[in-house]
Amino acid sequence: MAATCPSVGKSNYQAVWAVLEDVNGVLQKPTAADYIVPRGNATMNQTPTNSASEELSESLNVTDQFQDAVDAGEASIPMYLRLDPSGGHMQAHALILAAMGKVQERDAVTASLTSEVGAEDDTIPVEDISGGVLPPSGVVEVDTEKVRYSGRTIEDGVVTALTNCERGYAGTTAATHEAAASLTLKSRVYMQDTCRNRVSIWMKDDHTVTFGSGGAVTMTEFSMSNSGGQNVDVTVQFQRMGYCGRSFVSGTPSGQNITVVDSKDRSAVKAYSVGGYIKNTTKNLDNSGAGYRITAVDPVAGTITVEGTITSFADGDQLDAWTPLSSPVGEPLESRRASIYIDGQVGRIREGSLSMGTPAEFLQEIGDEYPGEAVDTKRELSITMNSFFRGDDAAELGKGYDGYEIPVVVRFGKEAGKTLSIGMDRVKMSMPEIGVDGASYTLDRTGAILGAKGEDALYIVQE
């Protein structure tokens, strides 16, 4: 008996790609490196609104309706944090870069030791930093020793020391290093910038692929808990959505034009948008792995026009959306591997979250069917921490009432090469709230993540 698939799409069959755009707003083709494994179902929608006619008649019924210019679409992409243990880009590199603005690659930054450092010292004084910045946390190499640090000393806006150092990191041996010894930052650092990349989002929902161009990342949220995988949730707003579904060839293609119908021999041309890619499933043809790009859609003729050689396409051939063959990046991190450093000390919390709101406003002008470019607005950065309410924590009430600032580092993962940290030099804590969880009192604390000078409120570090 032949195997058959249901006509209804399977909700557990999904894949996502997020691609940095070469030109903002111009749809970028996905590659295997852009693949994201969604955690649960990702969604993408752009729904036009309609305005009812204001004309009156001898009836209480609405007599007409007008379609409005389309607002920005929105994609929601839940995932687990996945890191490449060989040092390559993390899963969703494009989204993290688009949320922040720029990336400082490994080995770009060097410095010198200000004085001799002993094998047991947990502070490393530095000077003559060049090539970029030393973030609030990261991994450096001095001679043959790797050191992971979780704090830094800043004087007059200049980093003068790395603190809370874990010596002999990643299987190396702690050693004494002479003054003026060279130090190299081995971490990749995502940093804030006033100009950000835009992304194209591709989402495969079983038999149909939807895609959006000109995407601005507007929210990135990292959760902190003791169960499950390490959650990351990203929201993208985009300019224009397209789609590419399933159809069948009707008749013999004429040149690059294909008449497409559905399984009931009705026109299927509305299942396609320019920019999508198809493959011939019946004959296992995908343009040598590149897919056939749709360059035109003619609703009147019922045809789509594609790039590539299609002389082998024949009547009845099944056409499906093409996406690149892709493999996941690394393994998902466990949330129980997370840790937090509050004012240089290991913090004790039950759960929490770190939210990076990076809102943007899309321009809309008369004559434009779809939104124009996006203009960034003020960031909304915050952290929440829920802990058990111990006796020593009572002072948090008075301190929070007054408001106070502390540096915070959140680290996801514990193994070398499989760790991501988020460093914040200025977190202004507010008045906490006392709560109850079972037999224990709890304390909910919220902090606003602030900048000091320029774009320096927050750093994401792939250690």
Q: How should these model regions be labeled?
A:
Residues 2-119, 123-463:
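Signature of extracytoplasmic/envelope-associated structural regions
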